[in-house]
């Protein structure tokens, strides 16, 4: 008789050698497209290590982003600009190992950090290869229409790409701070043009950060082949993402408007992830009257 794998507790946290959960379908781009067609919201959180990634996966989170936000929440930097490609590969590999050990099904996305793709398409390809070899299923890069040729170059060579518009933290100094983007008619038109260019270039996903809810809703309808993931962009996107530390209330400063502390009413970290998934799926988070502009 085959015995179930034994989970041995250690003083340093426990990740079982094989998942005790029922087998689930691995998340893939076709699976995400099916979810969108069915009207099911996509959930995403950031994670930077094996344990949190495994717990998020067990709670049913579909996508895990190894964000360059690790510079601020893990390394103590004031922005994401100081994060290196080596840093991103290290944390991506850690998350990938955590998911592998529990037979995780989440779709793993890794940020391409500042300075790793702007010089040339060839530089971007080399950087993307390192992240994919570390375990990523997709890479994410920030920037408007100027990144479209790079996106197309990567996609044509088999690298799935998630784009990022609105507030782009890597260029926060050029934007004048952490401000809502696309509020003016001119700003909205520019965002729309860039979003369409990125979809045409082959981007499969698009993070919209701190973009007015109505504009995000309109863009989502206009981008049938590019799944919009909102953070401070209202409830009309195809899915939502939050930074791990924000959604767990691990923050000593003022909470951003678009954040909700899911740990406040949860008995465990896994419970907080489950509450987040449930709230996004049933439409109670985000609440446009509280979490959007």
Curated annotation (Swiss-Prot):
Binding site for Mg(2+): 68, 111, 142
Subcellular location field: Cytoplasm
GO molecular function: 3-methyl-2-oxobutanoate hydroxymethyltransferase activity; magnesium ion binding
EC numbers: 2.1.2.11
Catalytic activity reported: 3-methyl-2-oxobutanoate + (6R)-5,10-methylene-5,6,7,8-tetrahydrofolate + H2O = 2-dehydropantoate + (6S)-5,6,7,8-tetrahydrofolate
Cofactor remark from the record: Binds 1 Mg(2+) ion per subunit.
Gene Ontology CC, one term: cytoplasm
Chain residues that bind 3-methyl-2-oxobutanoate: 68-69, 111, 140
Major place of residence: cytoplasm
Keyword Repeat listed: no
Swiss-Prot/TrEMBL keywords: Cytoplasm, Magnesium, Metal-binding, Pantothenate biosynthesis, Transferase
Cofactor(s) required, per the database record: Mg(2+)
Pathway: Cofactor biosynthesis; (R)-pantothenate biosynthesis; (R)-pantoate from 3-methyl-2-oxobutanoate: step 1/2
Cysteines engaged in disulfide bonds, as pairs: none
Gene3D superfamilies: Phosphoenolpyruvate-binding domains (3.20.20.60)
EC category name: transferase
HAMAP family reported in the protein's UniProt record: PanB (MF_00156)
PANTHER family according to UniProt: 3-METHYL-2-OXOBUTANOATE HYDROXYMETHYLTRANSFERASE
Record family assignment: Belongs to the PanB family.
Subunit structure, as described in the record: Homodecamer; pentamer of dimers.
Role, per record: Catalyzes the reversible reaction in which hydroxymethyl group from 5,10-methylenetetrahydrofolate is transferred onto alpha-ketoisovalerate to form ketopantoate.
Protein name in the entry: 3-methyl-2-oxobutanoate hydroxymethyltransferase
């Amino acid at each position: 008789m085959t015995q179930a794998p034994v989970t041995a507790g250690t003083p340093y946290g426990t990740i079982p050698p094989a998942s005790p959960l029922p087998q689930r379908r691995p998340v893939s781009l076709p699976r995400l497209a099916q979810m969108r067609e069915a009207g099911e919201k996509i959930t995403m959180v950031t994670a930077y290590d094996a344990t949190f990634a495994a717990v998020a996966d067990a709670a049913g989170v579909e996508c895990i982003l190894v964000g360059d936000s690790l510079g601020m929440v893990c390394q103590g930097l004031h922005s994401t600009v100081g994060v290196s490609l080596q840093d991103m590969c290290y944390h991506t590999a850690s998350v990938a190992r955590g998911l592998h050990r529990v037979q995780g099904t989440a779709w793993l996305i890794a940020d391409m950090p500042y300075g790793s793709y702007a010089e040339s398409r060839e530089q971007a390809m080399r950087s993307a290869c390192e992240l994919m070899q570390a375990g990523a299923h997709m890479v994410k890069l920030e920037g408007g229409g100027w990144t479209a040729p790079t996106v197309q170059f990567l996609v044509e060579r088999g690298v799935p790409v998630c784009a990022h518009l609105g507030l782009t933290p890597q260029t926060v100094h050029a934007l004048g701070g952490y401000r809502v983007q696309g509020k003016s008619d001119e700003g909205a038109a520019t965002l729309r043009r860039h979003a369409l260019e990125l979809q045409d270039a082959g981007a499969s996903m698009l993070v919209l950060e701190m973009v007015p809810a109505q504009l995000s809703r309109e863009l989502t309808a206009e981008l049938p082949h590019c799944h919009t993931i909102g953070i401070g962009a209202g409830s009309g996107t195809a899915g939502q993402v939050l930074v791990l530390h924000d959604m767990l209330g691990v923050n000593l400063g003022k909470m951003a408007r678009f954040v909700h502390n899911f740990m406040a009413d949860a008995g465990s970290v896994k419970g907080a992830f489950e509450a987040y998934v449930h709230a996004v799926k049933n439409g109670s988070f985000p609440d446009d009257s509280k979490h959007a502009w």
